[in-house]
Amino acid sequence: MIILAGNGYSLLWPRGQAIKRFDWKPGSLVVPPGGWFHQHFNSGAEPVRYLALRWGSQKYHEMWGEGRGKADVDVKLGGKQIDYEDEDPLVRTMFDEACAKAGVKNLMEKYYQVK
């Protein structure tokens, strides 16, 4: 992902290990390692614009055997997606703090409501 405009950060981590934070700004390049969980956060006052380059086309759907399968399926059901209510509380705390530091409101509250 190439950041074209805006400021924020990405969280990246392999299953069962510590979350690592990487701050970004225009010109930054973010490349999550294969098989790692990752999230991207706009914590600034301006919209973020980015160019996401990825595998997953018809030609490269199974590059390195990882594919995109189950990216939208909950990890509890064998997928690769961590639902908001199941994420590490540190993720939400970090975003709340980043928004407060930038003087912006966290607009994600409605998505954190338990289903």
Where in the sequence are the language-model features?
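Double-stranded beta-helix
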Residues: 41-115
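Short, conserved beta-strand element in jelly-roll/cupin
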Residues: 1-14, 57
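Beta-sheet entry/capping signal
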Residues: 1, 29, 39, 49-50
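Histidine-centered metal-chelating micro-motifs
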Residues: 9, 29-30, 34-40
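Short acidic-glycine-tyrosine-enriched beta hairpin
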Residues: 2, 14-34
